[in-house]
């Protein structure tokens, strides 16, 4: 199986995180620049549900009155602005317009503005509770549609940014790769299993056990179930400790296989800053690709135009 993406990923993003000054107070920040040269690996699709709702810029800040954005969609909560005006219907229409735009572009991943009553997923600003009860209205729609979700604030950390990028590449690959035989299924799992084990070892081990016990023949439905399980795992972030431990483990394998030493790769317990760790990870990616040795922590790379 080819493990190199050649087509750019269509990546949605909260417009205020793409430098568009569309927040209620006319502010915005370009978080996509944090990807550096990698930002050209994506086709960006900025949307702002609040702007598309017709509320304009600047506008009165809004809040959820009730349980959460999901409850708003179910008709059990309201959206009101600072003056107390009910803008529920307007915001839902803006969210629907945003979803329609993303779906037209075949977008399946989204960089969202955390803390927003519209785009927030795990933290929102609700009445009398700054942390709120997530998700926001648009965030609830993204969750319902199984989007690969990236909190914009995480892009400020070079290691977290690397983690999101490698999992997004693997997610995009897993979503589209053909699995039409038992051999395809085993090869698919071999490519992603090390990354899955790092993120969720228990579930990954269970998947491996099920594969080992498969009966003869190929069952397409079972293969698609496994694909979905893998994609659910890949949505979850890893941790710094796991990343460092797996980096060292993969480096030891690479060193034994090639005889090549990489002086910049340090042991998990060695002290260094986030930029150094990110440099180690990218060095392993580059060297593994050039020597055709699988780097299990980042098995899928983008090498398009």
What are these regions (language model features)?
Residues 18-26:
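Short N-terminal binding/cap micro-motifs at the start of the first secondary-structure element
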Residues 27-45:
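Short catalytic helix/loop segments, enriched in acidic residues and glycine
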Residues 45-61, 152-162:
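Short connector loops at secondary-structure junctions
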Residues 58-90:
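Phosphate/nucleotide-donor binding subsite
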Residues 83-103:
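Glycine-rich anion/phosphate-binding loops
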Residues 98-166:
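Internal, conserved structured core segments that host functional sites
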Residues 166-223:
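A conserved mid-domain beta-alpha-beta active-site/ligand-binding segment of alpha/beta enzyme cores
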Residues 221-305:
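Extended non-globular C-terminal regions
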């Amino acid at each position: 199986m080819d493990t190199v993406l050649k087509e750019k990923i269509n990546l949605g993003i909260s417009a205020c995180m793409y430098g568009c000054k569309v927040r209620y107070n006319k502010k915005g920040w370009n978080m996509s620049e944090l990807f550096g040269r990698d930002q050209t690996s994506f086709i960006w699709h900025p949307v702002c549900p609040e702007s598309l709702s017709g509320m304009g810029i600047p506008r009165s800040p809004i809040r959820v009155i009730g349980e959460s954005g999901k409850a708003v969609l179910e008709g059990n909560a309201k959206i009101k602005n600072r003056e107390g005006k009910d803008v529920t219907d307007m915001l839902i229409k803006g969210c629907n317009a945003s979803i329609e735009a993303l779906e037209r572009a075949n977008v399946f991943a989204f960089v969202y503005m955390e803390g927003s009553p519209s785009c927030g997923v795990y933290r929102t600003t609700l009445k009398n509770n700054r942390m709120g009860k997530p998700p926001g209205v648009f965030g609830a729609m993204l969750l319902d549609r199984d989007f690969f979700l990236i909190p914009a604030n995480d892009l400020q950390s070079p290691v977290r940014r690397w983690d999101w990028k490698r999992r997004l590449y693997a997610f995009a690959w897993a979503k589209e790769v053909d699995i039409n035989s038992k051999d395809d299924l085993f090869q698919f799992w071999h490519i992603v299993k090390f990354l899955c084990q790092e993120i969720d070892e228990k579930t990954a081990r269970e998947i491996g056990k099920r594969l080992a016990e498969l009966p003869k023949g190929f069952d397409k439905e079972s293969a698609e179930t496994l694909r979905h399980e893998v994609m659910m795992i890949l949505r979850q972030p890893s941790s710094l400790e796991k990343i460092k431990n797996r980096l060292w483990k993969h480096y030891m394998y690479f060193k034994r296989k090639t005889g090549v030493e990489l002086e910049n790769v340090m042991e998990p317990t060695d002290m260094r800053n986030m930029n150094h760790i990110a440099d180690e990870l990218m060095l392993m990616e580059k060297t593994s690709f050039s020597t055709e040795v699988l780097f299990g922590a980042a098995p899928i790379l983008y090498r398009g135009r």
